[in-house]
Amino acid sequence: MKPSIYSLTRDELIAWAVERGQKQFRATQIWDWLYKKRVQSFEEMTNISKDFVPILNDSFCVNPLKQRVVQESADGTVKYLFELPDGMLIETVLMRQHYGHSVCVTTQVGCNIGCTFCASGLIKKQRDLNSGEITAQIMLVQKYFDDRKQGERVSHVVVMGIGEPFDNYKNVMCFLRVINDDNGLAIGARHITVSTSGLAHKIRDFANEGVQVNLAVSLHAPNNDLRSSIMRVNRSFPLEKLFSAIEYYIEKTNRRVTFEYIMLNEVNDSIKQAQELADLTKTIRKLSYVNLIPYNPVSEHDQYSRSPKERVLAFYDVLKKNGVNCVVRQEHGTDIDAACGQLRSKTMKKDREKVTATK
């Protein structure tokens, strides 16, 4: 199985071409064809030597993904189900925001973090995506825009799809460098957010990278007992370790951290828990932000339900009175398989039923 050429940063592409007797400008031409003209095959690169095109074809594919399902919401949200070369399925979501077009990408096939409310973890991690497979998600959404010929572009990226990004650290960092490259897609670092469930040692590594990419932490509980019961990762990285890493990140980068907090009815949404959350974030208040997220119910996790609006607002009021920067997240795609992992799970179930029916 040939790797995608999207797996290479521009410097890596230059080094690869030079090793094969090409001038540096040849790699720059290839890069422009990929990310500015956004061709889907090497044969479309008309200023590349005909002798070199077969070498490219022997070494790489361009886009390794195949589109399986597309769902479009009334609010303009688009959910894609892509098939990888090995037949595995991943999800990508396009969200139309007032500030631009944001794409949520997947970094792993399945997830081992084990959050008890999440559709992503219904299927255990089968493998990491390589950086080319992550970049390809952006490229296919951008192709959707290019085909419409309305001058639209992917302006923001959130690494919050299926999988734990920091459990696939090397490939995610390569992906970030590719999409941020000023000579390519040029998606600004401050328009990119990486979300982690709380791998404290990787938060420290990320702080040391010197990138301007935003960091979000999936918190979802204000104390260790509750967080360990709904997020298995907390048993390895309890709040003390997590917040030590977050404080290091803030000190090192002087950048704000966003805390994601899914509102689960009568689980983590009481007034007492709101005060606990305010107290937990007190020392980093100036450089932190809490995002309260309405829960998208998952049939396999029917022990959880969405917090009623009045409980969300009461929780929000406690945070605001304590000086916490917070917002209730606007919902997208509520009329399609909105929860991360739902579309993939449903499609895999249908595929299994088809196989069973033909036996």
Curated annotation (Swiss-Prot):
Residue sites binding [4Fe-4S] cluster per the record: 111, 115, 118
4Fe-4S is among the record's keywords: yes
Reaction catalysed by this enzyme: adenosine(2503) in 23S rRNA + 2 reduced [2Fe-2S]-[ferredoxin] + 2 S-adenosyl-L-methionine = 2-methyladenosine(2503) in 23S rRNA + 5'-deoxyadenosine + L-methionine + 2 oxidized [2Fe-2S]-[ferredoxin] + S-adenosyl-L-homocysteine; adenosine(37) in tRNA + 2 reduced [2Fe-2S]-[ferredoxin] + 2 S-adenosyl-L-methionine = 2-methyladenosine(37) in tRNA + 5'-deoxyadenosine + L-methionine + 2 oxidized [2Fe-2S]-[ferredoxin] + S-adenosyl-L-homocysteine
Binding site for S-adenosyl-L-methionine: 163-164, 195, 218-220, 296
Entry cofactors: [4Fe-4S] cluster
Cofactor note: Binds 1 [4Fe-4S] cluster. The cluster is coordinated with 3 cysteines and an exchangeable S-adenosyl-L-methionine.
GO MF term list: 4 iron, 4 sulfur cluster binding; metal ion binding; rRNA (adenine(2503)-C2-)-methyltransferase activity; rRNA binding; tRNA (adenine(37)-C2)-methyltransferase activity; tRNA binding
EC top class, as a word: transferase
Paired cysteines (S-S): 104-340
Organism superkingdom: Bacteria
PANTHER family listed in its UniProt record: 23S RRNA METHYLTRANSFERASE, RADICAL SAM CORE DOMAIN-CONTAINING PROTEIN
Function as written in the Swiss-Prot or TrEMBL entry: Specifically methylates position 2 of adenine 2503 in 23S rRNA and position 2 of adenine 37 in tRNAs.
Name of the protein in its database record: Probable dual-specificity RNA methyltransferase RlmN
Organism: Streptococcus pyogenes serotype M18 (strain MGAS8232)
Origin organism lineage: Bacteria, Bacillati, Bacillota, Bacilli, Lactobacillales
